[in-house]
């Protein structure tokens, strides 16, 4: 397993997000440090996905900023992105490519070095042994979600994981597989920011929740 890169504090400072005439959240500040798990809660439409996209630098806040190690992520850009894995609620898989091919491309784009054996092992870790090679269009929704999440099995060295509804479409065994990966990452000093409607406890030592309702 690769050594974890240094985790610099992730800070959200006075964030405000507006959609149309509606303010989703405002005055939102928090800090995520290595070894911590932070769940973002709130009702549908409260801005959970927008917040994660802001944290990743994929969406500009209407006010405030996100910092990594005290520096604005807008200035750091690629340097910050190289230290993060973001898995959105959409799987972002190419239907005409296999799970193995999709994972290989995702790793290459993220700068994660992984050979065919490691890719196969990562997919097996998520319960896709024997399903590595069919095109993704032939997989069930749960299998597609597992294929997307297999990046986590190869991302032990990447300090920050940002996960939007990672347990969607997963059966109980797959949920436990993903929870185990998250627990392991946090125990090694990584940080995880995530949303979920799944109520089972991940069981990390340092776990917090921020609810967007009323911000």
Residue ranges of predicted features:
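Conserved structural motif at the start of ABC-family nucleotide-binding domains
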Residues: 10, 25-27
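Conserved ABC transporter NBD signature motif
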Residues: 64-75, 79-80
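Q-loop/switch helix immediately C-terminal to the Walker
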Residues: 90, 95-111
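Conserved ABC ATPase signature
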Residues: 96, 135-142
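Conserved ABC ATPase "signature" region
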Residues: 104, 116-131
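Catalytic Walker B motif of ABC-type/P-loop ATPase nucleotide-binding domains
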Residues: 161-165
């Amino acid at each position: 397993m690769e050594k974890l890169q240094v985790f610099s504090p992730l800070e959200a400072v006075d964030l405000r997000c507006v959609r149309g005439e509606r303010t989703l959240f405002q005055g939102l500040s928090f800090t995520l440090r290595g070894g911590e798990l932070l769940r973002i809660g709130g009702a549908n439409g409260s801005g959970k996905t927008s917040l994660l996209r802001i944290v990743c630098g994929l969406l500009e806040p209407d006010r405030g900023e996100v910092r990594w190690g005290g520096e604005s992520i807008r200035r750091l850009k690629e340097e910050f992105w190289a230290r993060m894995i973001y898995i959105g609620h959409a799987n972002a898989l190419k239907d005409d490519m296999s799970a193995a091919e999709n994972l290989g491309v995702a790793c290459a784009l993220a700068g994660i070095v992984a050979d065919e054996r490691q890719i196969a092992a990562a997919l097996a870790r998520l319960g896709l042994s024997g399903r590595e090679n069919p095109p993704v269009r032939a997989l069930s929704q749960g299998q597609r979600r597992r294929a997307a999440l297999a990046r986590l099995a190869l991302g032990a060295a990447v300090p920050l994981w940002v996960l939007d509804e990672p347990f969607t479409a997963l059966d109980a065994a797959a949920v436990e597989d993903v929870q185990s990966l998250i627990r392991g990452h946090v125990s090694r000093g990584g940080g995880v920011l995530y949303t979920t409607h799944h109520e089972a406890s991940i069981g990390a030592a340092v776990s917090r929740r921020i609810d967007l309702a009323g911000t």
